[in-house]
């Protein structure tokens, strides 16, 4: 700041003509002093170097201002080159990101010991660069590549929903498949049972096989269904037989329907031997017991039916004994008719032995209805 007033004094002295040579010498001395001061100051301080540059601008301002612009542009370049502290800082900045590149290394406790030696010798800018560069390829695969690959990949395999998706649908599919298999098993069980029912209607040889079938628990329902079909078909067949025979012989027309009605009425009364004439001798006794129990629950209905039959029989004459030719199909029923009547009377007082012998041929259509109702209730029991 003291140089500027000195310059103003020199300008004032320039007004005197003899002092021009003296002023020129002073300017040269000031320029030499200005050059010497920046050379001595950079070791101590860098910012003061800008101060002596201003008088150079003033000196050059008189002769030409063009030289002042390059002189003003040079000092920032000189700052970067001439400062050893800045070089050290720049060296540290260059090597610090190299040490920070691993990123995960300072977080993990094992790598802290490896990072500490790099921080200790930053005074030598060349040594940490040489050490950090070979260490980078060693640390980078360990920190970034291996640990995430080793730890996260199995975690993704555990956490992913694909595993759950693979687990859940099989259970539902297995349930559906099991249910389908169960239904198919039931249908398969129903088909042979129905075939057995068709064979039972045709012959008596299949009944022992059928008696074994209800013993297995899964085939009980199917056997009950087949029993319903068999009994219904038999009732219809028994109702149709007297009509066919009536067309053959006039004498049998009044006798066979009465026999059919007698056997059907006895079936409604609930005699235990009702199954024998129909060919059901090999059926299980448990089914007979269930039928007897279900028939005991409804003795009133059967008693009313038998009373109506008796009233109708009193009005008409009893039928004549059947001829041997017309009763060929019902020969077993004739032999056991008296026994059935006695047993039916002993089991239930509502059923009278005369109901079968004096039954009307017209009421034969009414009795099969009661017979059709009883087996449905038997299967429900």
From Swiss-Prot:
GO terms for molecular function: actin filament binding; phosphatidylinositol phosphate binding; retromer complex binding. Residues 224-235 have a biased composition (Basic and acidic residues). This is CapZ-interacting protein. The modification Phosphoserine is found at residues 68, 82-83, 105, 108, 116, 120, 123, 126-127, 135, 143, 177, 179, 216, 224, 249, 271, 302-303. Residues 25-83, 99-381 are annotated as: Disordered. The modification Phosphothreonine is found at residues 124, 222, 306. Stress-induced phosphorylation of CAPZIP may regulate the ability of F-actin-capping protein to remodel actin filament assembly. Disulfide bonds: none annotated. Residues 352-381 have a biased composition (Polar residues). One of its GO terms (cellular component) is cytosol.
């Amino acid at each position: 700041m003291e140089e500027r007033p000195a310059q103003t004094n020199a300008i004032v002295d320039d007004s005197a003509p003899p002092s021009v040579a003296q002023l020129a010498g002073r300017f040269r001395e000031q320029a030499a002093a200005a050059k010497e001061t920046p050379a001595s100051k950079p070791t101590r301080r860098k910012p003061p170097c800008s101060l002596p540059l201003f008088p150079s601008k003033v000196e050059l301002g008189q002769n030409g201002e063009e030289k002042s612009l390059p002189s003003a542009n040079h000092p920032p370049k000189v700052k970067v080159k001439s400062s050893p502290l800045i070089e050290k800082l720049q060296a540290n900045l260059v090597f610090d990101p190299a040490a920070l590149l691993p990123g995960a290394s300072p977080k993990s406790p094992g790598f802290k010991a490896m990072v500490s030696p790099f921080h200790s010798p930053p005074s030598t800018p060349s040594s940490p660069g040489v050490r950090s560069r070979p260490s980078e390829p060693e640390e980078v695969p360990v920190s970034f590549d291996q640990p995430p690959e080793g730890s996260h990949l199995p975690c993704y395999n555990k956490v992913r929903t694909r595993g759950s998706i693979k687990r859940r649908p099989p259970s539902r599919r297995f349930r559906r498949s099991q249910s389908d298999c169960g239904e198919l098993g039931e249908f398969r069980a129903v088909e042979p049972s129905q075939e057995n029912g068709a064979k039972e209607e045709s012959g008596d040889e299949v009944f022992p096989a059928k008696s074994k079938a209800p013993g297995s628990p899964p085939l009980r329902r199917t056997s009950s269904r087949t029993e319903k079909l068999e009994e219904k078909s038999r009732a219809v067949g028994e109702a149709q037989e007297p009509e066919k025979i009536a067309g053959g012989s006039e004498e049998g027309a009044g006798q066979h329907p009465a026999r059919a009605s007698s056997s059907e009425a006895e079936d409604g009364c609930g005699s235990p031997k009702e199954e024998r004439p129909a060919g059901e001798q090999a059926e299980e006794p448990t089914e007979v017991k269930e039928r007897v129990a279900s028939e005991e629950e409804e003795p009133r209905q059967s008693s009313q039916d038998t009373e109506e039959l008796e009233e109708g029989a009193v009005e008409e004459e009893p039928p004549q004994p059947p001829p041997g030719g017309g009763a060929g199909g019902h020969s077993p029923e004739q032999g056991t008719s008296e026994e059935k009547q006695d047993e039916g009377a002993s089991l239930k007082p509502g059923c009278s032995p005369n109901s079968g012998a004096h039954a009307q041929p017209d009421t034969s259509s009414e009795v099969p209805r009661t017979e059709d109702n009883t087996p449905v209730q038997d299967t429900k029991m």
